[in-house]
Amino acid sequence: MAVTNVAELNALVERVKKAQREYASFTQEQVDKIFRAAALAAADARIPLAKMAVAESGMGIVEDKVIKNHFASEYIYNAYKDEKTCGVLSEDDTFGTITIAEPIGIICGIVPTTNPTSTAIFKSLISLKTRNAIIFSPHPRAKDATNKAADIVLQAAIAAGAPKDLIGWIDQPSVELSNALMHHPDINLILATGGPGMVKAAYSSGKPAIGVGAGNTPVVIDETADIKRAVASVLMSKTFDNGVICASEQSVVVVDSVYDAVRERFATHGGYLLQGKELKAVQDVILKNGALNAAIVGQPAYKIAELAGFSVPENTKILIGEVTVVDESEPFAHEKLSPTLAMYRAKDFEDAVEKAEKLVAMGGIGHTSCLYTDQDNQPARVSYFGQKMKTARILINTPASQGGIGDLYNFKLAPSLTLGCGSWGGNSISENVGPKHLINKKTVAKRAENMLWHKLPKSIYFRRGSLPIALDEVITDGHKRALIVTDRFLFNNGYADQITSVLKAAGVETEVFFEVEADPTLSIVRKGAELANSFKPDVIIALGGGSPMDAAKIMWVMYEHPETHFEELALRFMDIRKRIYKFPKMGVKAKMIAVTTTSGTGSEVTPFAVVTDDATGQKYPLADYALTPDMAIVDANLVMDMPKSLCAFGGLDAVTHAMEAYVSVLASEFSDGQALQALKLLKEYLPASYHEGSKNPVARERVHSAATIAGIAFANAFLGVCHSMAHKLGSQFHIPHGLANALLICNVIRYNANDNPTKQTAFSQYDRPQARRRYAEIADHLGLSAPGDRTAAKIEKLLAWLETLKAELGIPKSIREAGVQEADFLANVDKLSEDAFDDQCTGANPRYPLISELKQILLDTYYGRDYVEGETAAKKEAAPAKAEKKAKKSA
């Protein structure tokens, strides 16, 4: 049934829709059989279709259209015959993905009058290959040729098993019918090749569209080019089908030193150099009312001369206008789609490229450009040209008509008769269109667990008296200059001498930086880095608790990489492996050794450091495995005289490390054992270490080891919101870090122990809320629970043990008891809550917190109240008043 009106078009779409639904279920084997049969039929009809196209359109050359038809069938088939376009395209068992191809549906094919049969063949074949249907809207000037090409492909496809209405066309095309087709609700994609107006209409249709832009291909010929090849290539390309290929050359820009030679070569090989009035006459005929004159499109050179009012020999290949103006006022500077060519002189290569840039920007942006140079010996020019030209195809030493369509002069450039021009040309793609653009890809993504790790320092020395033995490794490794980073107390009390005396005796030069204070600041760190830069150590030894070790780690980074910006080091990340800022490679200038003199921080084995910006008071927890020391020395002799308060705060810091590591979303079977063992040691030995001190060296040593073991656990499993809030409390109110954790940990457990939290932290291996169960496991491991206890009872016993332990170690019952004034706390609690939410530790917490929830935990901990799920501060404050009112009423 012929399609001559909208009703007939709607009927056609319905038939094609039915056919495509059937075709969508075909296998790859069936599709490939149809694809091959259709390509064979199109190739076989290449000559009659070419003759029909020239006769009907009055454009082009039969012999060249034969080549285009052959290309559209043979080259397209050869390029895509083995491409998978049906069903499962790929499977990746390692990453658990399956990619599945689905057809788009019905495609509207817009076909130009310049390439009426080859474009129809091309679009039909790639539609068949992808299980799509296609309906053509041909150009009125070449409708019969286009529709005949489509019919030949269709009949061959039907004979090979395709549904009968898989390809359709409009018999009497009009603007009305083209618009109706493009806007039809059952059209799924528009594949538009044609003039700017039609392509713009396609993109304005509200449907997905793949269109092409105008071409205005400039050619640059430099002084190193093979002139004979360059001229021959341009002539071959420009005369191909009388220049109707949109990629064909429109201008040549020749470097001055070879301009005359190029000009002469053109003149002696079929190029006609327009002179005087002839040039003006052709300029006048190229454009009509400011647009390309359709009368010259696809016409031979001698006919264009006749239109301009003069004659040239019939064997003239192209008309060449030597011009100087590079803007829209010059007709030769436009796309001409005919054997007419502008020729410009450039003073040098850079000037030639600049002119080419202007020509592209004027009318062919995104399409094609060409350079003739010595490509083997001028890679810099090839690169320069490639970077300067805003075109999707940048051809080197290649005839543009044949080269742009791909697979003829470069065999990785995809063959196509629809050439995308990217966003420059107002297109959705910037490559040669092929089957991949006509399929929808579905990705089946199976749940996969994150790759985890267990990273430690290369060496960990422990037991009493291990310090001098460990330092022997520093000596035998050949280190010559050691910088010791510590605090003034440890320096004044001879702790640093225990290191320097051993090293100096072995001939190692030493320098001591002892200005680190509690909560190290950026200014102190920078001062230490300056000393490192002047002393140039090959080993840095951090001696002390968390503060000297944290400071030393940042000094190490600044010494190794002085170009580093602290703001980038402090940037938060969701996944340490995917962070935006990558820490630089460490250990090039110096090795890092951490000697811990407190039992709690764990910093000697962790990739973490905390530093305070003294300009703002903000604490920044930094994290990266580049910060992990190369060696940790855990010598309990260094903590025998540790004061009771430091023992208590450090011990409870270690308890919190182990607790948070065990319930973290990154917890693993590797970190679990260390977290549990650390808690077991701390439960057994922390009270004795606190009360008896150096009189019980075994207890001191076990707590010292437990702190490092907990450090290993949280170095790999990370921490949670207890530390997030503790960091901010310490920064704002100068509460010792271990004390802040001790104050918060019980309410954090109450908060996390919820199997139905407001939000669960998103991490692949953490598939459901587990904190409640894991807290109960801790109670079991510590021997706190009794047979038959339910989970809730186990957690209550865990909390009771912690409260008892804190009381025994002299920990205040609330933040208020720790000395923070109520007005000061309430004035800052909102900011504390938001800053804690933004802390790096928050992301590993098993429960993803709301800022309001963190605020509630902080308020409850300030007043010494138990956190209760769903109870806000307002409710808690109202409850006593309500009870008092009720009591009065009863009385």
Swiss-Prot record:
SUPFAM superfamilies: ALDH-like (SSF53720), Dehydroquinate synthase-like (SSF56796). The keyword Transferase does not apply. GO terms for molecular function: acetaldehyde dehydrogenase (acetylating) activity; alcohol dehydrogenase (NAD+) activity; ethanol dehydrogenase (NAD+) activity; ferrous iron binding; identical protein binding. One of its GO terms (cellular component) is membrane. It catalyses: acetaldehyde + NAD(+) + CoA = acetyl-CoA + NADH + H(+); ethanol + NAD(+) = acetaldehyde + NADH + H(+); a primary alcohol + NAD(+) = an aldehyde + NADH + H(+). Changing F670 to A/E/V: Disrupts spirosome formation. Affects the forward activity of ALDH. Under fermentative conditions, catalyzes the sequential NADH-dependent reduction of acetyl-CoA to acetaldehyde and then to ethanol. Under aerobic conditions, despite the reversibility of the two NADH-coupled reactions, wild-type E.coli cannot grow on ethanol as the sole carbon and energy source due to the down-regulation of adhE transcription and the inactivation of the enzyme by metal-catalyzed oxidation (MCO). Nevertheless, in the presence of oxygen, AdhE may act as a hydrogen peroxide scavenger and have a protective role against oxidative stress. Induction: Expression is about 10-fold higher during anaerobic than during aerobic growth. Contains two transcriptional start sites, which are both functional. Both start sites are NarL repressible in the presence of nitrate and activated by RpoS. Fis is required only for transcriptional initiation from the upstream start site. Fnr can regulate expression from the downstream transcriptional start site only in the physical absence of the upstream region. However, under all experimental conditions tested, only the upstream start site is active and acts as a silencer of downstream transcription. The active site is at C246 (nucleophile). It is an enzyme of class 1 (oxidoreductase). Gene3D superfamilies: 3.40.50.1970, Aldehyde Dehydrogenase, Chain A, domain 1, Aldehyde Dehydrogenase, Chain A, domain 2, Dehydroquinate synthase-like - alpha domain. This is Bifunctional aldehyde-alcohol dehydrogenase AdhE. Has previously been proposed to have pyruvate formate-lyase (PFL) deactivase activity and to catalyze the quenching of the PFL radical in an Fe(2+), NAD and CoA dependent reaction. However, it was shown later that AdhE does not catalyze the deactivation of active PFL. Inactivation of PFL is attributed to the CoA and Fe(II) present, which appear to increase the rate of deactivation.
